[in-house]
């Protein structure tokens, strides 16, 4: 493999050197291709290289922003480094913006005595309620992963059994809608969806299938293949959680992992640390799952509080598939659209 890589590097170096492209960028691009097994057609090769070079500049800029904000956030070359910003949004984010409408059910605020008694750190992964990180692929189905993650947690807490549930069941079969300002926001597979709609589908459908019986394909199927004999979990209702991060922590401890929506545009090159740079809390374009919270010391701050957020971009992204979001500042709108199913 090393011999092949060296040969490709030599050929590529001769090709791009005539165009005045720095050798360092050439080397980085070839290392990127090797690490992430990227294959391009002849026509696509230079286009991807140009995007990669542009993204190197963006990564440098993001790291400077993090330093200026005394943030622990780290950005770097990852598997998305050959995608333009528009491609990243189209492939991996949700084109159904999450909006908290007045007709959605909302849970009560928790008792102050209970809130004051919750632990300083809590993680449902260590308690067995969280399945391994999944990968939505180039399909805007994040909403389905956020939903299944929540229901998986609720089912575990209720039945003491962790069952991986089928996102594809939702992608193919869920066409529920909610209304906002006279317009319909419907679940449309890879074209986006919302967790409240998905909960309603599961309730009306009498359950959701297991992952093993209805595996994920990263594309919207031409038909629904639901089989009631393979139901993995059922729910009876759902509720939104008040827009309050202290209350959110209480509900995580008392009820389980929470489905949320957030602004993830700046997550493209995230590789680690606590995300704490400016983003848009009013543009909720990605569905994810909060599984716990904690705090850490950084070079800038002691006891930095953060949320532990499970993503659906594979375990080779971020912190082994997770992102840590600064807690207490409504980072990226983390508290604006929070929900949980009810068994």
From Swiss-Prot:
Single GO biological process annotation from the record: hyperosmotic response
Post-translation changes: Phosphoglycosylated, contains GlcNAc-alpha-1-P-Ser residues.
PROSITE patterns reported in the protein's UniProt record: THIOL_PROTEASE_ASN, THIOL_PROTEASE_CYS, THIOL_PROTEASE_HIS
Residue span(s) of the pro-peptide: 19-117
Active site: 142, 286, 311
Signal peptide coordinates: 1-18
InterPro entries for the chain: Papain-like_cys_pep_sf, Pept_asp_AS, Pept_cys_AS, Pept_his_AS, Peptidase_C1A, Peptidase_C1A_C, Peptidase_C1A_papain-like, Prot_inhib_I29
UniProt keywords, alphabetically: Disulfide bond, Glycoprotein, Hydrolase, Lysosome, Phosphoprotein, Protease, Signal, Thiol protease, Zymogen
Broad enzyme group: hydrolase
Keyword Glycoprotein (UniProt): yes
Annotated GO MF terms: cysteine-type endopeptidase activity
E.C. designation(s): 3.4.22.-
Cysteines paired by S-S bonds: 139-190, 173-224, 279-332
Family label: Belongs to the peptidase C1 family.
Protein function: Cysteine proteinases 1 and 2 are believed to participate in the breakdown of protein during differentiation of Dictyostelium as a response to starvation.
Protein's name according to its UniProt entry: Cysteine proteinase 1
Gene of this entry: cprA
